[in-house]
Every structure is written in C-alpha cells, then in structure tokens.
Regions:
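The canonical Cys-X-X-Cys-His
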Residues: 39-42
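N-terminal [4Fe-4S]-dependent radical SAM core
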Residues: 1-32, 44-81
Length: 158
C-alpha cells in the first residue's frame, strides 16, 4: 500500500487511440497514464519516460480527457486493446469513469475489443462490453495468498 496517496491529475489528449505495433491489435487504447497498482513485476514501467513525472511508476496517475470520438465507425472490424500499459479498471475508474466513457463512445461502432485488467470493477460494464461483436477480457490474478499479497504491498483482490 502507498505511504501516501498517489498523485492524480487530469490531462487533455488529442486522441485516445495510438496506432500499435503489437501483433494482437491495430490500436492501443489507454484511458490512463500510469497505474496505481504499483506491481513490482510491472512491464509497463517503461512508460514513465513519456511522462513529466519524477515520481516512481505506480505512484502517479494521469487521467486522460479526450474529445468525443467523432467517427467511431472508423474502427469497425479493427482490433482495439484497452489497457496495454495501464489497468483500465483501476480503483480510480470508479470516480473518473474514463473506461466506461470510452466503451459508450465506441458502442455500435463494430470495433473488436480486448480488455486487460485485474479488477472486478469490470463487472460494472459487463452488459456494455457484451454489445461489442467481438470482445475479449483478460483478467489476471497474481496471487490468492493474502500473506504474500500483503508482503508485496499489494491491494486486496476486493
């Protein structure tokens, strides 16, 4: 757990979509920059160099604010990976709702979505996710052992 609260700020971005070189998707979509999970094994910590933060990865979160997606049908049949370098269902998603806003803006577009998370908050949006023609959810659990979790400073699963 954090010794202090994470640094959270809202940032305006021109677009929520990033063209991707990943073999699993055409676009990488991350509603947040940073991650408040602070996992010791995190592969996304390289993203810090693209921020203005001096703080360690896992102690800050930039909440992306983007213009409404004007032509969501442009993404029909395209593979969108939501959460490639952040968890789109961080605890802060309850307050900011950026992932839900993204899904609502894409609803009916015909986009194929993949979502990676370790949060049960995704259940809130399950009915919305089901409206996409092809939707995949990857849900990771790093341990079921609460003692191990606590030793590594991780939040509880609930």
């Amino acid at each position: 757990m954090f010794a202090r609260s994470p640094i959270i700020r809202e940032i305006e971005v021109k677009s929520i979509f990033s063209k991707s070189n990943l073999p699993v998707c055409e676009y990488s979509v991350n509603p947040y920059v940073g991650c408040t999970h602070g996992c010791k094994y995190c592969y996304a910590c390289f993203m810090k160099r693209f921020t203005v933060h001096a703080e360690p990865w896992g102690t800050f979160l930039d909440v992306k604010v983007w213009p409404e997606i004007k032509n969501p049908e442009k993404y029909a049949g395209k593979e969108l990976f939501i959460g490639s370098v952040t968890d789109p269902y961080l605890p802060e998603e309850e307050k900011y709702g950026r992932t839900r806003a993204l899904l609502e803006q894409l609803q009916g577009s015909g986009a194929k979505i993949s979502i990676a998370t370790k949060s049960d908050l995704i259940m809130r949006d399950l009915e919305l996710i089901k409206t996409f023609p092809e939707a995949r959810v990857s849900w990771s659990v790093n341990t079921l052992n609460e003692d191990f979790r606590a030793e590594n400073g991780r939040r509880s699963l609930h």
